[in-house]
Amino acid sequence: MAYQAPRRFVMWGALVCIACVLGLMARAALFGGVAYITTTDGSSNGGDVLCDGLPPFVVVVDAGSTGCRAHAFKVTPGTVAPAFTLEPAGARVKLETPLASLAGKSEGEVSDAIVPMLEEIAARVPAKDVPNTPVYVWATAGARALSETQQQTLWSTVTNVVRTQTQFKLPNTADSFQSSEENHFRTIAGEEEGFFAWLAANYVSGVDVTAVGTSDAPRSEETVGALDVGGGSAQIVSLLAQGNGGQSGNENSIGSSSLDELAKNVYVKSYLGVGAAHAERRARTEAAADALKNYKKETTFPCGFKGEVEEVDGVTMTGTGEYDACVELIQRLTATKMKEDGVKSVATSEYNLRAPDSALLPINKKFLGMSLLFHATHFLHVAFPGSLDSFPEPSLAEIGDAGRKACATEWERIQRDVDGVDENTPTDRLPGRCFDTALIQALLGTETGFGFGDDEQRISFVDDVDGKGVEWTMGAALSLAHRAAQHSVGVETTLACAASSSGGSSTYKKKVAVGIGAKSRTGRTIRRWVGFLCAAGALIALVAALAGAVEADKMWRLTKPAERIMGPGGIAMRKRGSLSNF
């Protein structure tokens, strides 16, 4: 039988080609995800997306130290520009993974973590408005703890993921306004976070500070202060009293012409490392270190519920539920942290958090205590009925009494009777609630805290006001929309807009999604399975081609030279100058 080399080579070549095609299909399915093309769609002022005027919605993602929370806000223009109103567009979307924990991860891992959250929050916005809705992913204390290099790499990855896998509005990459895009994905300073929280606290309380510079500007005494304690940091924000903070204009009204100018008259202080998660970790770590210095493998911890056991750095730590001792421990650690950071109080020139009197005067008739301040006091109120009846406006003295009762409760009883009672206290946070209640006293009191007296009852511990959440993300959305509104009526702002904003126009590139099932979770699952099957097919085809090549080489070596060109028996197989039957 004649040697069939050419036909076999054609077959093996085809297998290699099939392997290559399947490999490319696998790569596209596994790593391509949703793709977008750009089409020209009307005109844009270029630069910052807010230069185009008030957006229909704004999405702000709070990338905190304990997880991410995405918020969508609806922006409605007022009857007279530049007035507008802002309200939440549905419930926030939570992601348990802290963004900072994704530092150093691949783009695929970052995508898997944040894209489902962004898709879900996009569903809060009408489909036709998503391409005109800007998104801002802003990180707080957790990301501030990363190095500058880690942050830059993380933000570069996040930017690429959001730009290529969502339809939210972002600055054109062709524009020379790189800082505009960077503003969408960045780590914000603690002072910014605090100011945004203050804006939100006032807005939901009926004090529209975005009306500054108009005849509708609120009166100074109407404003409220904001206190915010998270997992990594704590902030206090308050409009300074007249004569102590540069207040100008009519003594009863806010004289600032813009939010940027108003920020200069607001006392904003943010303290990194004194939030609940960071502070408790440090307290337990130091307690374990002290035990190891004395060659002990067991020790007690005053900030744990009585009998609660936890192992830290190889040391078994048993809670004793001593509330007052816990407060003193936190006060000492807070002062130590301030000394390490070189931060002294402007009021006392000592290493503490004390705010100046001008920030605490009765001009701020009320302060709103947010985030952990609400969660911890609400826990005391619902988990120990009757111990905090004055909630949501208890004094520090009343919180102290309730905290002593809670911390002294046997851990076994806490697990049996308290776990699951408070919707804001998940099981994994329950052991830390004794510490949290003591932290309130330490951070708000007069020893090392902000300076509130034990018997004062002007702090409202709230999660929302009239159904509106009190979170800094709302303040951020207010600030962004305010700039857009002012720019739309010709008021000078800090926005980086192209020169064409005064009359000309430039091409605006709109992103359009392409691909089947590109945006849905089901679509991604289908793509992965298709990718795996294509990859498997490519591997099988390649192995078959290689096996065939090896077999061909063996046959080639065993075949007589004459038979490589002639048929068996040496009979010439040439016909019309070509080889046949091969």
Positions of the model-derived regions?
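Helix-loop boundary elements of multi-pass alpha-helical membrane proteins
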Residues: 1-16, 549-571
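Interhelical loop segments of eukaryotic multi-pass membrane proteins
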Residues: 30-45, 82-88, 488-498, 554-570
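Serine/threonine-rich intrinsically disordered cytosolic regulatory regions enriched
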Residues: 572, 577-581
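A short acidic Gly-Thr/Ser loop motif
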Residues: 61-69, 227-234
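Short loop/turn segments immediately following beta-strands, especially the blade-tip
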Residues: 75-82, 241-242
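N-terminal module-boundary/linker segments of secreted carbohydrate-active enzymes
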Residues: 45-61, 65
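Helical "lid/coupling" subdomains associated with nucleotide-phosphate turnover
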Residues: 58, 72, 98-130, 136, ...
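Membrane-embedded alpha-helices of multi-pass membrane proteins, especially ion channels
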Residues: 19-34, 541-551
